[in-house]
Amino acid sequence: LKCNKLVPLFYKTCPAGKNLCYKMFMVSNK
């Protein structure tokens, strides 16, 4: 599954790239 940086709940479901998904989410939220 690809992490959707537009959905804050979705990055939590990313098992391998949790930190990466979180960073992408934060960057898109800047």
Swiss-Prot record:
Subunit architecture: Monomer.
Q: What is an example of a GO molecular function annotated in this UniProt entry?
A: toxin activity
Query: Which Gene Ontology terms of cellular component type are present?
Result: extracellular region; membrane; other organism cell membrane
- The reply to whether Transcription regulation figures as a keyword in the UniProt entry is no
Q: What is this protein called?
A: Cytotoxin najalgesin
Listed GO biological process terms: killing of cells of another organism
Which family does the record assign?
Belongs to the three-finger toxin family. Short-chain subfamily. Type IA cytotoxin sub-subfamily.
Q: Kindly list the cysteine pairs connected by disulfide bridges.
A: 3-21
Q: Which InterPro entries match?
A: Cytotoxin_Cobra, Snake_toxin-like_sf
Going by the UniProt record, its keywords in alphabetical order are: Cardiotoxin, Cytolysis, Disulfide bond, Membrane, Secreted, Target cell membrane, Target membrane, Toxin
Subcellular localization(s) per the UniProt record: Secreted; Target cell membrane
Q: Which domain of life is it from?
A: Eukaryota
Per the database entry, which stretches of residues form a coiled coil?
none
Q: Which SUPFAM superfamilies match?
A: Snake toxin-like (SSF57302)
The function of this protein is:
Analgesic toxin that is blocked by atropine and naloxone, suggesting the involvement of cholinergic and opioidergic mechanisms in its antinociceptive effect. Shows cytolytic activity by forming pore in lipid membranes.
According to UniProt, the tissues expressing it are described as: Expressed by the venom gland.
